[in-house]
Amino acid sequence: MSGLPRSVPDVLDPLGPGAPVLVAGGRVTGQAVAAVLTRFGATPTVCDDDPVMLRPHAERGLPTVSSSDAVQQITGYALVVASPGFSPATPLLAAAAAAGVPIWGDVELAWRLDAAGCYGPPRSWLVVTGTNGKTTTTSMLHAMLIAGGRRAVLCGNIGSAVLDVLDEPAELLAVELSSFQLHWAPSLRPEAGAVLNIAEDHLDWHATMAEYTAAKARVLTGGVAVAGLDDSRAAALLDGSPAQVRVGFRLGEPAAGELGVRDAHLVDRAFSDDLTLLPVASIPVPGPVGVLDALAAAALARSVGVPAGAIADAVTSFRVGRHRAEVVAVADGITYVDDSKATNPHAARASVLAYPRVVWIAGGLLKGASLHAEVAAMASRLVGAVLIGRDRAAVAEALSRHAPDVPVVQVVAGEDTGMPATVEVPVACVLDVAKDDKAGETVGAAVMTAAVAAARRMAQPGDTVLLAPAGASFDQFTGYADRGEAFATAVRAVIR
């Protein structure tokens, strides 16, 4: 379809034919937003402070503007559509809010266009969020829907953007959404939504933990609300949900209205009186986190009528994504696991607790999160720790307090060489990769090579050398995938 209806439904207000819309951000999301707005007859102007990002838009004949100029002109726009990376504190968005100009994200735009019938009959949105496990759960959900014979598309923060899939013939959308996306999607009301867990994360973007939690809670405002009962924050959100149907899931035996585990099988007592879904042993994701992900996905799939057999088939054949508890190698009785996607302390704790004896490679950008509770919970599993990245001193401090007997090595590189150790970790326990890094090797690769070598020296047969960093990767790597690949390369080198 093309063109907005002349009589604009309330769900699209203030977006109408010819409406002046400021697109904040000229990168991939901004390109998709500008294309959709143009297609439906609005008048977009693209804002970015990088001229390189604006050039393709200008070549397509779209007006472009810098952030500072856009702030001065903000009252001339009916709407701002922001890319997820723009926080509310960004001067441009703060100016829009002060001027009373509505701010949507790309997900909000997609939701409203879909709800208005601009792409045909609206789809049913099944939305997954949480601090950890979103991608695995959403992928499992999509596999369950397909196994059940449903026309479903995987999208959101995984795969394709929602705006990019609305032309596809689908009845259901399996959507992974981050807190950034949800913050700018205030009207989202999914068919069913799940909050897996809530832990400190992205506090450099959200002003407070309360704001982060409130963003996550938006997925529980539709018809069916699903949340993890073993997580106190997620359970509290479920208690406050306005959804007509509220479903919890837990690792223990489920009560009526819940999914859980009984006799080593997943059981549904929410959408059936007492339905056995599948054996825990068939879940390919290791540890309790894999069981929780499968329970959440099953709850959403059951909410739209997917039968137990299809759920079991999907889980049995499911393959975990790269850099998510991925076994890289087993050598000399030591298992090397890449969980580079564990980018916050909550995820790292879940990862460590999946194994009995762990040499933990950790560190990076903590984004304001504390590790103390997590390190205390995992201390009994740790037989060694190798710390990397900008915020490694915070990890060292938590280990010193909660796991003082665990040997610790810090790997230092580049601009960090002037501060090689903390009080808790003496200079003798620091590896300076700047002294002998290989020609042409990136800092990240050199750091990981040293880290894996140190971890190998600590490990004994039966141990797991686990990359579960608890932090973001951008201080030394281009992303979590780059960090995971560096780990795999280093492992292959050390076991040769």
UniProtKB/Swiss-Prot annotation:
GO MF term (any one): UDP-N-acetylmuramoylalanine-D-glutamate ligase activity
Keyword check for Transport? no
**What name is this protein filed under?**
UDP-N-acetylmuramoylalanine--D-glutamate ligase
Q: Among its keywords, does the record have Ligase?
A: yes
Residues holding ATP: 130-136
Q: Top-level EC class, please? A: ligase
Report which reactions are catalysed by this protein.
UDP-N-acetyl-alpha-D-muramoyl-L-alanine + D-glutamate + ATP = UDP-N-acetyl-alpha-D-muramoyl-L-alanyl-D-glutamate + ADP + phosphate + H(+)
Purpose: Cell wall formation. Catalyzes the addition of glutamate to the nucleotide precursor UDP-N-acetylmuramoyl-L-alanine (UMA).
Organism, by scientific name, is Mycobacterium bovis (strain ATCC BAA-935 / AF2122/97)
Q: Where in the cell is it found?
A: Cytoplasm
